[in-house]
Amino acid sequence: LKNKDFGFPKYKCKSNPVQSYTTNNQNTIYIKDSYIKLPKLKSLVKIKLHKKIKGIIKSVTISKNSLDHYFVSILCEEEIEELPKTNKNIGIDLGIKEFATMSDCTKVENLKLSKEYEKKLKREQRKLSRRCKLAKDSDKKLSDSKNYQKQKKKVAKIHNKIRNKRKDFVNKLSTKIINNHDIICIEDLNIKGMLKNHKLAKSISDVSWSEFVRQLEYKANWYGRKIIKVPTFYPSSKTCSSCGNIKETLTLSERIYHCECCGLEIDRDYNASINILRKGLEILREEKVS
């Protein structure tokens, strides 16, 4: 977002690292070449357009992140065509080691971004703490300390990189699943409850299950796909996908499911994904009957 004739927007809440405001289109917003016309601004604003705008512009949101990068998000109204039928359905078991294990034998590795950037982030955060202390010892406001503000941006840059990588991963994976399947069955995970487990909380936050499910749901709604959520307490991991026997004693450390009734040996998560698909289709049949 660039224009030499006027300054950048000023936001009321400076403490929030991500700041934004929304303005509705009253025939005052339009895009021409690499410029956008915004309400109350006399001049056009130069932008980097990431994709072609389709439909009728309803509103725009101007936002600024912690790195002082400005963005314009454009809300448009358009008719979206449903995707052609694939005659393929899939069950998805979400996990920590593997982000997703699917009933077609596909495994998607977790990015483990927090672990990848952990050392670098801790190092830069320690520097930030030291510069905070130096500023306070010198009776300086943090907003007036150039060294503190410079280091603060370094930390923000790492967080921004993690956030962008995670967002890109979830977007591409959810789009691929929606494009290739008519019915997607997934567990209705109690993520808030799972976060209470302090040993797993960090890993669960890192994998972005909630955002993945959110994207699956809105894309399914757009493109005529069906999302079926299997109840939270359905024993997908403990149930044998071959004979239906429930193994009550299954522990988290057992990665291979061994059925004591029929002798089936199968990857634990793959077994769960088959059960999730089966249960989801059962729920769908019951919905149609009722």
Residue positions per predicted region:
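Nucleic-acid substrate recognition interfaces
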Residues: L1-S290
